[in-house]
Amino acid sequence: MSPVASTRWCPTPEQLMILEEMYRSGIRTPNAVQIQQITAHLAFYGRIEGKNVFYWFQNHKARDRQKLRKKLAKQLHQQQHQLQLQLQQIKPKPISSMISQPVNKNIIDHHNPYHHHHHNHHHNHHRPYDHMSFDCCSHPSPMCLPHQGTGVGEAPSKVMNEYYCTKSGAEEILMQKSITGPNSSYGRDWMMMMDMGPRPSYPSSSSSPISCCNMMMSSPKIPLKTLELFPISSINSKQDSTKL
């Protein structure tokens, strides 16, 4: 019994070189006519059938797809690795270190107008009279020093002493103005400044009024005295007369 001949195709080097050249030229899936022509041409270099040509092109396309898939996977892996390196370089600081750092209030006030406004409003809320500290020094307005008191024998007409400090030439004039009327709501006793003492001299070139506050701050301290406009003895005599 003769041995069965092997049906496995063993291409020769010339056949493989011709097939690879055809594949590089652009032939990927040859039709039936092309397969017959290629088989007839390769039969000069060895045994070959039409199915061998068909399967060679199919296997060669599969190998190329596998190589392309591996190449794309490798490129994707490299891109992910580079992205991780970039993220590590720009990694933000931990939250604990940011909390431990002191906050500069001046920077916050400069960059946040709302915080600046709120801070000023809060500051003015606790000190509402700071803006009135030097009003008398900035304007030549009258200055009153009342001392309200309550007691028996309060006069029906109230007296308000207003002091004006003006300047005419090189001399200063202290004027006192008395205002009476039912609309005034002051008490019976008033704090008055006595013995004003020597007042400082100013150059005669300026003709604008100078406030009392500036003059008082530049002059030595002046003692204050309380005058009894309504002595107690007169009040007692009035009470005795009413009893009679």
From Swiss-Prot:
SMART domains noted in UniProt: HOX
**Is Nucleus given among the entry's keywords?**
yes
An example of a GO molecular function for this protein is:
DNA binding
Keyword vocabulary terms for this entry? Developmental protein, Differentiation, DNA-binding, Flowering, Homeobox, Nucleus, Transcription, Transcription regulation
Q: Name one GO cellular component term.
A: nucleus
GO BP: any one term: flower development
- Localization, UniProt: Nucleus
Alphabetized Gene3D superfamilies for the sequence: Homeodomain-like
UniProt tissue specificity: Expressed in aerial parts of seedlings, inflorescences and flowers at low level. Expressed in a restricted number of L1 cells at the lateral regions of flower primordia.
Which protein family is named in the record?
Answer: Belongs to the WUS homeobox family.
Q: What does this protein do?
A: Probable transcription factor required to initiate organ founder cells in a lateral domain of shoot meristems. Involved in the lateral sepal axis-dependent development of flowers, probably by regulating the proliferation of L1 cells at the lateral region of flower primordia. Required for the formation of the margin cells of the first and second whorl organs.
Listed name of the protein: WUSCHEL-related homeobox 3
